[in-house]
A protein has these predicted regions:
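Rossmann-like flavin
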Residues: 16-19, 27-28, 46, 59-67, ...
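N-terminal FAD cofactor-binding segment of flavoenzymes
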Residues: 1-29
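FAD/FMN-dependent oxidoreductases across multiple families
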Residues: 178-180, 206, 211-283, 292
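Predominantly flavin-linked oxidoreductase catalytic cores and closely associated redox partners
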Residues: 53, 57-58, 62-226, 284
């Protein structure tokens, strides 16, 4: 998208320096996998540890330099259709609604945004994307989609323990104790920060299993704890993760628009990466719209 991204100042500041994969055998033991046993799709040579928020802000600035209008804080709430059933655009949510659901004195109705083509990029399980898939039967030839929940924390750690560019992935304990599946990551970013988290498949059998608490248990493992001791958590979050892969992709286009990114399900789970494919899907869709 930006071949000269280094010269243009893209916030990719921490190249991957070491790539490690572990299987946690118990609450105290771990087996580091030999590099030759790690699937090639999990290798990260040439990649960067980034803050996706910083990259998205940088991309937003680049878009605005091209006179693209960005409306942060205004989420699309409804799909607008022409009389012939083709997509006309979207309507943003109403503002100034009280807790009882009634308009208040500062009520402002949502804006209608019309376009020749509307591209939907809501992320995993986007509510408008699901309506479009159902309306146009876009998933009739696709495998059922598969989901997980991803829980993430950002920590500031002791500089003596910080190893910029170290990338760690793994599986095993504690999820294997509850018959659950999933995995974890820990990345050493810039400014003495690490990002860490766990993805748990939503097919877990034990109804009492609590993914958030499983992550808290995981942080007590010596492999993880060694970096966090003396540090502090500075932010956290969670989100749904789409995991069905290539065969679960719906048809991407419909009359008046298309689905891109995780709204369609472009996460490449064999690589545990989706930002690359989300961007590429947007680029391909943009080129198709330009040529239409």
């Amino acid at each position: 998208l930006f071949p000269n991204w280094k010269e243009e100042g893209a916030p990719l500041n921490v190249p991957v320096t070491d790539d490690e994969t572990y299987f946690l055998l118990s609450d105290t033991k771990a087996q580091k996998m030999p590099y030759w046993m790690v699937p090639k799709s999990m290798h990260n040579e040439g990649n960067y540890v980034i803050s996706l928020g910083n990259v998205v802000r940088w991309l937003g600035q680049k878009a605005e330099e091209l006179e693209v209008s960005i409306f942060p804080g205004f989420a699309a709430s409804e799909i607008l259709y022409h009389e012939d059933g083709t997509v006309k655009g979207i309507q943003t949510g109403d503002m100034g609604i009280g807790k009882n659901g009634e308009p208040t004195h500062n009520f402002t109705p949502g804006y209608e945004l019309h376009a020749k083509y509307t591209l939907f990029a809501e992320g995993c399980r986007g509510h408008l994307g699901k309506r479009l898939i159902a309306k146009y039967n876009l998933d009739k030839d696709a495998d059922p989609q598969h989901y997980g929940i991803g829980i993430k924390e950002l920590w500031e750690i002791d500089p003596a323990k910080h190893k910029p560019g170290l990338v760690m992935h793994g599986a095993g304990w504690p999820l294997n104790e509850t018959g659950s599946s999933g995995g974890w990551w820990l990345y050493h970013a810039e400014n003495n920060q690490v990002t860490l988290g766990m993805i748990v498949d939503l097919s877990y059998e034990n109804p009492h299993m609590y993914p958030f608490m499983e992550m808290q248990r995981w942080k007590t493992h010596p492999t993880i704890k060694q970096f966090l001791e003396g540090g502090k958590r500075i932010s956290y979050g969670a989100r749904a993760v789409v995991k069905g892969g290539f065969n679960a992709l719906p048809k991407l286009t419909f009359p008046g628009g298309c689905l891109i990114g995780d709204d369609a399900g472009f996460l490449n789970f064999s690589k545990i990466k989706g930002s690359h494919t989300a961007m590429k899907s947007g680029m391909l869709c943009g080129e198709a719209v330009f040529e239409a």
